[in-house]
Curated annotation (Swiss-Prot):
Part of the Sec protein translocase complex. Interacts with the SecYEG preprotein conducting channel. Has a central role in coupling the hydrolysis of ATP to the transfer of proteins into and across the cell membrane, serving as an ATP-driven molecular motor driving the stepwise translocation of polypeptide chains across the membrane. This is Protein translocase subunit SecA 2. GO terms for biological process: intracellular protein transmembrane transport; protein import; protein targeting; protein transport by the Sec complex. Pfam families: P-loop_SecA, SecA_DEAD, SecA_PP_bind, SecA_SW. ATP binds at residues 84, 102-106, 496. It is an enzyme of class 7 (translocase). The keyword Transcription regulation does not apply. It catalyses: ATP + H2O + cellular proteinSide 1 = ADP + phosphate + cellular proteinSide 2. HAMAP family: SecA. GO terms for molecular function: ATP binding; protein-exporting ATPase activity. It comes from the Bacteria. Keywords: ATP-binding, Cell membrane, Cytoplasm, Membrane, Nucleotide-binding, Protein transport, Translocase, Translocation, Transport. It is found in: Cell membrane; Cytoplasm.
Length: 795
């Protein structure tokens, strides 16, 4: 029986309900154990028949869980604990299970994945990296295959492998798929760039379990997945803008608020720019690109910090994941920011590419019929999980009591004091032989602590974005006697740290944090590296008034206190501030930081709603064309719409003496180069009929030439128009968001401004699709090559 004493009252009620189902599952244990392998495997077919006959997943849940539990033991030698069954039930219900480090989330997922896969609509488990997806699919896949289900892996251990549509279709048609969140997102975007049925592979998104759910669904929610296409014309303004920004004086030429992460050019800076470039009006339309590049350069210098937001590796800017400090391979900032950072670091500026398609994790995962999550730290963000994803967070009891001691923070006035105190504490703990995990907030700070430990003669390993290739080995050794591992917060998630021989007697793993992170969940993840599965251990954080958290989110009185007392301390004789108000201060500041993060993610949802509506519309129309269904961009309808719109334009806006020129121009630009002209005496109705006649003749001629391939031609003409317009729209909306955010400084609501402009652009895009489809149908040249393949040349 599970003890509920330590849980929130709401969790008590939830868990009591789940306890009844657990009791039923436990009562089936003996029955399942008596079944032969063949009889146990036959249960899968039985369950599927029962679902077809009208039973629901909830009806068969207890029995299905009991089957998987028995299969887990027979195949893996692992029998899920009661707490793991409870976690599996939470996942089946479409909620997030908060399970502490080492509690066996991988095994827990086998039960809800099996159950939900029985419907034949697909079930996915999405991990943080390819290694985990491949490993878990291989290990847990043995259980699913034993029970007659197919298993696919959406990633490859060969990064160079380029999977074709047929391979991906085979993966996604599997009963259960293991992949990563990013791989799924990019596959979704690529699938919606397909031009034929044979190139499509993605099923409807049905059920998914997201590992490290808070990191993916919350912390990474603002990071868009972007497929880039053809490059923009390379700009030489990055270098010029960078030179001017370097000469600017903070708070004189530009305003910078580190707390709010806002920066913009002030009036004095505008005057300096006008003098520098010898232009009379800085914000004139013709100077738009110059203004854009200056703002990009300003952002690069003030909002992006080397060693914290990115590293320079082999002449390239590599972004760091804010949630775990890992390098985001293959990821670039959009809208020119990446190029501005390259210029700031005096690297070769890479071409700025257009965004062909993009989607945020929020919108990707909200497309699933049922979504569940697993994490070690989700409870503090339950309100946001409910509001954004309609997912409750249920804290699952640990199988063994948590024996880790979390000590109150040691608080210092200045950064040098804190660093000195931290190193002295590390020396004391190291002398006992107790293993230490020392966690810094950035690559730069981790390297500083590493240098200080070297000077102190303490051997250690350094784990950060620059040394991530050795991560698994370092983590495996971090729990050994006498080990000291210096790491960024990338050590907070991933492989468990197992204690070496004799370490428990020394007190277990010591986790030493050198600053509070921006989110309480990150701190909880770091603390959770110690005390795994009932192990002994402790955590201790060292903080100061100069930490990023306090600078960016601290109250004014704290900043005043620092200015008043910073010169009164001796860094070599650090003095901890023991008053209760300071402990409360750092706790409240972190809560404020969490609130800002939630607010920023909420704004991302508001911004992205316009893009999501447009994306759904475009993808729906594309799929209708590919599947041969009637949609808004049916070629036949477009001919009528475009010609009718042109006649309405002639009737309302064109003088009679300009009529012939306008009609001839329309024919030449959109329909045919064989211009025969029209008579002055023709009425608008006659002109309309004349244009329809030209269109019908051109299409009849192409139909006669292409025969059965004419439908393919029509579809290709419309798809090409949609794709060209959508690429322009995605790119424009990215630029628009940057501009709209900047308008906040002019006392305007950035979201309102964005939606207003996005709606205008949306209508322009639809008009452009119709007109370009019209041109593609009529002005294109078609033929067959010597192999009999259809060739289309669009003008």
């Amino acid at each position: 029986m599970i003890a509920f004493n330590s849980l929130f009252s709401l969790d008590k009620k939830r868990l009591k309900k789940l306890q009844r189902t657990l009791n039923t599952i436990n009562s089936l244990k003996g029955q399942m154990a008596t079944l032969s392998n063949e009889e146990l495997q036959a249960k899968t077919t039985e369950f599927r028949k029962r679902l077809v006959n009208g039973e629901t997943l909830d009806d068969i849940c207890a029995e299905a869980f009991a089957v998987v539990r028995e299969a887990d033991e027979r195949v893996l030698g692992l029998f899920p604990y009661d707490v793991q069954v409870i976690g599996g039930l939470v996942l089946h219900q479409g909620n997030t299970a908060e399970m502490k480090t080492g509690e066996g989330k991988t095994l827990t997922a086998t039960m809800p994945l099996y159950l939900n896969a029985l419907e034949g609509k697909g079930a996915m488990l999405l991990t943080n990296n390819s290694y985990l997806a491949i490993r878990d699919a291989e290990e847990m896949g043995k259980v699913y295959r034993f029970l007659g289900l197919s298993v696919g892996v959406g990633v490859s251990d060969n990064e160079e492998e380029d999977r074709d549509a047929a391979t991906k279709r085979a993966v996604y048609s599997s009963d259960i798929v293991y992949s990563t969140s990013s791989a799924l997102g990019f596959d979704y975007l690529i699938d919606n760039l397909a031009s034929s049925k044979s190139q499509k592979y993605m099923p409807k998104l049905h059920y998914a379990i997201v590992d490290e759910a808070d990191a993916v669904l919350l912390d990474m929610a603002q990071t868009p997945l972007v497929i880039s296409g053809s490059p923009r014309v390379q700009s030489n303004l990055y270098k010029i803008a960078d030179e001017l920004i370097l000469s600017f004086e903070e708070q004189v030429d530009y305003y910078f608020d580190k707390e709010r992460q806002e920066v913009w050019i002030k009036n004095q800076g505008v005057r300096e720019a006008e003098r520098y470039f010898r232009i009379p009006h800085f914000y004139k339309q013709s100077n738009r690109e110059l203004v854009r590049h200056l703002n990009l350069s300003l952002k690069a210098h003030k909002l992006f910090e080397r060693g914290k937001d990115y590293v320079v590796d082999d002449g390239e800017i590599k972004l760091l994941d804010a949630t775990n400090g890992r390098v985001l391979e293959g990821t670039k900032l959009q809208g020119g920011v990446h190029q501005a950072i390259e210029q700031k670091e005096h690297l070769n500026v890479t071409p700025e590419s257009r965004a062909m398609a993009s989607i945020t994790y929020q919108n990707l995962f909200r497309m699933f019929t049922k979504l569940a999550g697993m994490t070690g730290t989700g409870k503090t963000a339950e309100k946001e999980f409910i509001e954004v994803y309609d997912m409750e967070v249920v804290r699952i009891p640990t199988n063994s009591p948590v024996r880790r001691i979390d000590y109150p923070d040691k608080i210092y006035t200045t950064l040098p004091e804190k660093i000195h105190a931290t190193i002295e504490f590390v020396k004391q703990v190291h002398d006992t032989g107790q293993p230490i995990l020392l966690v810094a907030g950035s690559v730069r700070m981790s390297e500083l602590f590493s240098e200080l430990l070297l000077l102190s003669g303490i051997p250690h390993s350094l784990l950060n974005a620059q040394s991530a290739v050795k991560e698994a080995q370092m983590i495996a050794e971090a729990g050994q006697k006498g080990a000291v591992t210096v790491a960024t917060n990338m050590a907070g998630r991933g492989t468990d740290i197992k204690l070496g021989k004799g370490v428990s007697e020394l007190g277990g793993l010591a986790v030493i944090g050198t600053e509070r992170m921006k989110s309480q969940r990150m701190d909880l993840q770091l603390r959770g590296r110690s005390g795994r599965q009932g192990d002994i251990g402790f955590s201790q954080f060292f903080v100061s008034f100069e930490d990023d958290l306090m600078i960016e989110s601290g109250p004014k009185w704290a900043q005043d206190y620092f200015r008043k007392n910073r010169d009164k301390v001796n860094p070599e004789k650090p003095k901890a501030l023991g008053q209760r108000r300071f402990q409360k201060l750092f706790q409240q500041t972190q809560e404020a930081s969490d609130g800002k993060g939630e607010s920023a993610r909420s704004q991302t949802i508001e911004f992205d709603s316009s893009v999501q509506l447009q994306r759904e519309y475009v993808y729906r129309e594309r799929n209708a064309l590919i599947n041969g269904e009637s949609g808004h961009f049916s070629p036949r309808q477009i001919i009528d719409t475009v010609i009718s719109s042109f006649i309405a334009y002639l009737d309302g806006e064109v003088e009679k003496e300009e009529l012939i020129f306008e009609v001839n121009r329309f024919i030449f630009d959109n329909m045919s180069y064989n211009l025969q002209g029209i008579s002055k005496e023709m009425s608008l109705e006659e002109i309309k009929n004349y244009l329809f006649k030209i269109a019908d003749e051109i299409l009849r001629e192409k139909h006669n030439l292409l025969g059965d391939s004419f439908g393919d031609f029509e579809r290709t003409a419309a798809l090409k128009a949609i794709d060209e317009a959508w690429i322009e729209e995605v790119d424009y909306l990215q630029q628009l968001r940057t501009v709209a955010t900047a308008r906040q400084t002019a006392q305007r609501n950035p979201v309102f401004e964005y939606h207003k402009e996005a709606y205008k652009s949306y209508n322009i895009m639809k008009k452009e699709i119709r007109e370009q489809t019209f041109r593609n149908l009529l002005l294109s040249e078609v033929s067959f090559n010597e192999n009999g393949d259809l060739q289309i040349y669009f003008i």
